[in-house]
Each structure stands twice: as C-alpha cells, then as structure tokens.
Amino acid sequence: MALYELFSHPVERSYRAGLCSKAALFLLLAAALTYIPPLLVAFRSHGFWLKRSSYEEQPTVRFQHQVLLVALLGPESGGFLAWSTFPAFNRLQGDRLRVPLVSTREEDRNQDGKMDMLHFKLELPLQSTEHVLGVQLILTFSYQLHRMATPVMQSMAFLQSSFPVPGSQLYVNGDLRLQQKQPLSCGGLDARYNVSVINGTSPFAYDYDLTHVIAAYQERNVTTILNDPNPIWLVGRAADAPFVINAIIRYPVEVISYQPGFWEMVKFAWVQYVSILLIFVWVFERIKIFVFQNQVVTTIPVTATPRGEVCKEHLS
C-alpha cells in the first residue's frame, strides 16, 4: 500500500557553548548587527522623526459683527467717508462719518453645525456730488480649530479695491483662508491671539490707522486673509442711490500644519524602524543557522527529545 505524508513538524536542535566562547561572541555580534543598523538606516534616510504633519479640518468661524469702513471719494468730494462699529472711532471722524445700513447672514449649507459662509451687505448713503472710487473694509471673525491643534483667535478679512471711475456697487466673492508662518502646537488650547484685532476702546486715532492695524496683525504666526475676492466694480449710480458692498465670504476646509506630539513621533519612527528591522532579522537568522549547522564556531549540538519519548524513558 502506498504511503503519504500526512503530517510533519520540525525537530528542535539547540547548540550549547560557554558564555565566554566564540559562539557567544558571535551571537552578541549578530544581535548588534541585527538591531542597530536598521536604526541607522532609518535615521539617515531622513524623515525618521516626524517634525511636521498635516490634516484637514472645517474650522468653526463666526462673524463678530465688527466692521471698519473707509470709502475713498473723488477729489471734488472731500477725500473719504468712514464708519465703524467702534464708537470711539466714529467720534474721531467728525463730518466724515457716514452711517450705512448693514445686513448680514451666516449660512450652514451642509447642516453639520458649522457655518460655511457669510452674506454681507452694506449700503452707504451718498450725496449727489459724492462719488466712490475705492473701498477699504475690515470684518472680524472668531476662528477656532478642534482636532489636533486647538487654537482659538480673533481674526479678520481685509478688503481693499480702487478703480479710476466712480462706482455704484462692489461685489466680492472669496474665501476666508488660514495662513500659518509655522506649524501649530498640539499641546492644549492656544488662546494667544484671542484678542480683538482692533482696539475698539482706544480714543487715539493711531490705533485705528489701517497701516498700524495691518502691521500688528501680520506679526501673528497665524492669521486669516480674504483669498481670491474677485472684486466686481459696477458703475452707473443714480443720484440718490447708496453705494452698495455685496460680499460672500466662504469658510472652507483647511489643511492644518501642526507639530506632532511625542507618541505620534514615536509611532511614526517605530513603523520605519520595524519595516527595515524585519529584513535584517530574516537575513541574520539564515546566517546563524548556517554558522551553527556547519560548526563554523565550536558548539555542542543537542537534539530536543519529544515529551512523549521522555515519559517512556522514565517509565522504563
């Protein structure tokens, strides 16, 4: 009757030698060459320690209903008109103060609990002899992230447009984008910039000067800007019609750059190290088998006796 192999298992063979023998020294050297070189290879290949990472997040943005407007007029109209939601600023304007009609609406288009855009409309009443040639506008927002990095800050959108011909309406459609000069820290709440962009309680004109406001704002490591506003300047205003600013500002998903924490860095480094280590383990395992089987270093081979046979020997 023909016989077939139905089951097999390897027989364990051990090799014995003294702790001060060449075999022990070889094993120590093999262990060092197995575990240390993968660490050096992973480190020298760059990117071993994860110093910067990124992720996507929809920020929580809310319009603060703080506005500062400067409307630039033609030379025959007296320079400019101004208005803001800050009473101290308005008191400084004198005859140049002109109170507009403002309407705003924020919209959550995907119903995720976070606002997605702002609809802003401003109607500035003008006299028949006044003609607007340019606009400078600041809108302020509260801006917060919640996942890896958790900054909370007061930010702004600055719009500036000027044209050679008088206009009746300025239409703007852009994104409120996050700008980072360095990665955000993921170690707890960061409220360094949770202060008003404009010091609305100051009685000094210097604190409302746009040059000063923009310069101080740009000193921050994290800011927001109105990106791609695509201004459309409409002409042909009736004598008694106001100058209108229509703005749609979107709050898009942002790619956030941040400094990873300690355990994230260790996890990233560990994955790189282990992927190289497995190759070295496989290679040196084959080398050790060759060295001990062929007695390149002197040892005493011992074949392990199966447990069943050991019991039989004791019984006999």
UniProtKB/Swiss-Prot annotation:
It is found in: Cell projection, Cilium membrane. This is Transmembrane protein 231. Transmembrane component of the tectonic-like complex, a complex localized at the transition zone of primary cilia and acting as a barrier that prevents diffusion of transmembrane proteins between the cilia and plasma membranes. Required for ciliogenesis and sonic hedgehog/SHH signaling. Its main location: membrane. Part of the tectonic-like complex (also named B9 complex). Interacts with TMEM107. The keyword Translocase does not apply. Belongs to the TMEM231 family. The keyword Cell membrane applies. The chain crosses the membrane at residues 23-43, 264-284. Keywords: Cell membrane, Cell projection, Cilium, Cilium biogenesis/degradation, Glycoprotein, Membrane, Transmembrane, Transmembrane helix. InterPro entries: TMEM231. It comes from the Eukaryota. GO terms for cellular component: ciliary membrane; ciliary transition zone; MKS complex. GO terms for biological process: cilium assembly; regulation of protein localization; smoothened signaling pathway. Glycans are attached at N194, N199, N221. It holds the Pfam family TM231. It is a multi-pass membrane protein.
